[in-house]
């Protein structure tokens, strides 16, 4: 027990300490691609983590403390293809360090202060194509043991301490070398012996970068008969004289691409004289680029004479001022002028020029016509140019133009429908201000146009024929514009070959049902950043080839259930994020559809509810159908309850007095009646009731007590309550005096209906009908129930004659005596006049 207690006492603090350690200390690397790519950058590692899988192909160990790389250091990763060891403070690399990495193609050693590099350090790297050894304290290429890397294509040893340009003999064993970067070293002189290996074993695909080396001298003839793919000399010369002599030292060089000049932040030359380029006459060049040279001195008319036969010339950030140097008819086929300083637009006349790029230039606002008859590609973007009456072949001096980019300029007024430019395939106006585009069919003649960009051109589309003639168009971008009434009309009728359409940020609220009917080839449709309120899938039903649909950043609440089936079957990518979804049971089918279509919907997890308030900013996927089932149950129960209450209320309201009568029957059912009969009659017949009925019955023998409303009803009590409580409940029988006035009186009919109920509820009750006068059958049939009763039952009919009166009163008294408790007097009187009642129908 004591031993166990001691063990527990020791383990508890240890466990506490371990629990405080970060989980990264056990598994430090970030898994970028499972079992393939791992990033272990800046983790203070002193060795390679043991838990990295053997299948790893990309491993980043940069910014650690590996310091010493021993033999077979990476043999656990035979599949490795890319290894980054940048700035790991590596000082020693032993023999066979990378042995076994037969698939490694890229090795990066940047920023390591290597002091000892064994001759067999790079053995085993039979597939290595790129080796980066920037800032590795390398002093000479002779000390770099790479002669066996026959597949090496790129060697970057920039920013070291190499003083000699001498290329070792082993370069003859690197036949695939394409790029050698020696920039920012300490090379000052280049001699013929330095490049002897290039004379013996030409590397025709080699591009050589010597920028930022303090060159002072190049021995004449050094590069004679040498062929290079490219040579870059930027920020190399401290004076104009040195530059001139060094360029002359390149005489005899044949290169596909030559780059001269300086870097933006590495300026050494104060002035640039046209004579600097005279030495280029002794070189054979296909492409020439000059960058960041300004303050030209002297006449620059003949500046480019030595470049007359160059195919491609590029001027980057050059301040020429005068344009005389560009006004000659050189044989250039490709001219780039980027971010240069000119007084005015160059009026070029280059008969061979096929491609002209003139972008980001300063202080030029007015376009000037030029003559370029062979021109096919023209890029004039970002110059703040204005065009009046654009565009026709006379503006550019060519009828062969296929690519025209006028984007990011000022105002462009369309004055013609591109006459003479029928071969155009690419046209870009984005972020320029287009005018008069609604005046006529500006693109009518462009039947070969495949790409059109009029995005953010400040146009409001009114003219429905704006795209007439564009029968070959495949890509149309028109984002950031607007439409009349914010409605997208049917303007794409002729665009049957369209595959990409961008309508984002067009303030669209509605889309015509036939807007996309002609676009059966459309594959990509961008409807984002508009004001659409619903996902109307009927619009997209004709788009049989549609693969990508972006409806993000709208105001879509939902889509109708029956419409969701109309989305094209070809659709593979649908973006509905950033909309105002209504997560309510009304749209339950749509919300369920969102859950079912997660593979189709991009960013389904980012689809948020906008309403109701209790679900605002919650994911649409969090909506639960059970909520709707519960709500439906509650609603159903509530509806049924309301209906039942309503029905009961209506029945109670309709039969309120009948219920009162029923309650009274139970209350007074066993008591004695006060009245012999309750008389129901019309006020129009009150004289007959007073003078005949009351006088003969109450003053006759035997006397009968009648209940009359004008005499026996209690004041202050509702008429209906008096009728039931004083009339029916306290009377043995009911006398109904039927006349034309009775039939037409609502109160009389009401009293009669209550009397029927009273007769049904009380076994002793009886109704005696007295018909005062002959009634028209048409009038009597208006009261169906009364008509039926009078047709089937015995009633008394009043006749104003001596015999008729005698018979009437005898029969009425007999009817009233039925069920009446007999008194001795009443019995004797009744026996003196025994008579039978006669029936009249």
Swiss-Prot record:
Residues 24-632 are extracellular. Glycans are attached at residues 35, 73, 205, 238, 282, 309, 497, 526, 575, 625. Residues 820-841 are annotated as: Disordered. SMART domains: LRR_SD22 (SM00365), LRR_TYP (SM00369), LRRCT (SM00082), TIR (SM00255). Keywords: Cell membrane, Cell projection, Disulfide bond, Endosome, Glycoprotein, Immunity, Inflammatory response, Innate immunity, Leucine-rich repeat, Membrane, NAD, Receptor, Repeat, Signal, Transmembrane, Transmembrane helix, Ubl conjugation. It is a single-pass type I membrane protein. Residues 830-841 have a biased composition (Polar residues). One of its GO terms (biological process) is defense response to Gram-negative bacterium. This is Toll-like receptor 4. It comes from Bos taurus (Bovine).
